[in-house]
C-alpha cells in the first residue's frame, strides 16, 4: 500500500474515532446513581437520606480521571462538589448548618435513559424542615453527554414550585454552585475566567456574565469545569459569587432588586437551566464560548 493510502486510511480512522458517539451508562446502587463514559467512571448523583441535599461527586476530568470538584473542603464543609441549595428560605437553611435547619430530600431519583450516547437522570425533591411547612418542591432533570473525548456535559434543568408563599432574604448561599478541587483553584495556580475574559475573584465577583470557568494544571494535563447559564433563566445573566479558593455560583439572591429579599407566591414556578462543561485544556482550548453559543 502506498504511503498516501496509508495516510488517507489513518485520517479516515481518526475521523471515525472522533465522530463516534461515546457509550454512556448508568446504574443505581443504593442512594447513588453511578455514571460511566466508555467504561470509565465519570460521576455519581448522590441522594443519601443523611445528606443536606443531593449532589454530584466525584466529577472526573476527561484526561486525568481525577475529580475536578472537591468535597467538604477545609473551612467550608458545606461545599459538596456540584450542588443546588439555598439559605434564608422562609427562615430555613437549605445550604449549610445541621439537618434540623432544613434539608432537600430526594424522593424519586431514577434513571430515565442510559446505555446509548446519553444518560438521563430525573429526581423529585421536597424542601423540608422540622416544625415548618415545606416551602418548595423541585423537579430536576440531568442529561449527561460526551461530544468529544475531552468534553463531558451535564445539562441541568430544575423546576422549583412554591408550595406556599416564599421569601428568600438576601443571601450569598443560593442555587446552583460548585467547589473546585484545590489544585485547580486560583490560589494554587489555576485560572478563573468569565465570558468577557475577566479573570480572578477581584475582577469577576458580582459581575453578570453568561458563563464562568475554572481550569488549572494537574500533572501533565490541564483540566477544568465551566458553568453556563441558559438565556431563558430569570435574572439572566446572573451576577456571580466567585472565590479564588475554588468556589463559583451564579447567585441572583445576593443581588435582589430591593437589596433585601426575593418574594414568590404559592404556586409560582421557577425554571432554572445550566450546562456544566467538564473539559480538558483551559476555557479557550475547550472552546467554552462556542459551547455556550450551541447551548443557547
Where would I find each of the regions flagged by the language model?
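Bacterial Sec-dependent N-terminal signal peptides
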Residues: 1-23
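Beta-strand-rich N-terminal accessory domains
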Residues: 21-77, 281-283, 289
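A short, structured loop/turn motif at beta-sheet edges
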Residues: 37-40, 110-119, 146-150, 217-222, ...
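Acidic (Asp/Glu-rich), glycine- and aromatic
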Residues: 48-51, 55-58, 147-192
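Extended, loop-rich substrate-binding clefts of extracytoplasmic carbohydrate-active enzymes
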Residues: 80-150
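Beta-strand elements of well-folded, non-transmembrane domains
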Residues: 125-129, 142-146, 160-164, 180-184, ...
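Active-site/ligand-binding surface loops and adjacent short beta/alpha elements
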Residues: 165, 172-237
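Beta-strand-rich recognition/accessory modules
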Residues: 226-296
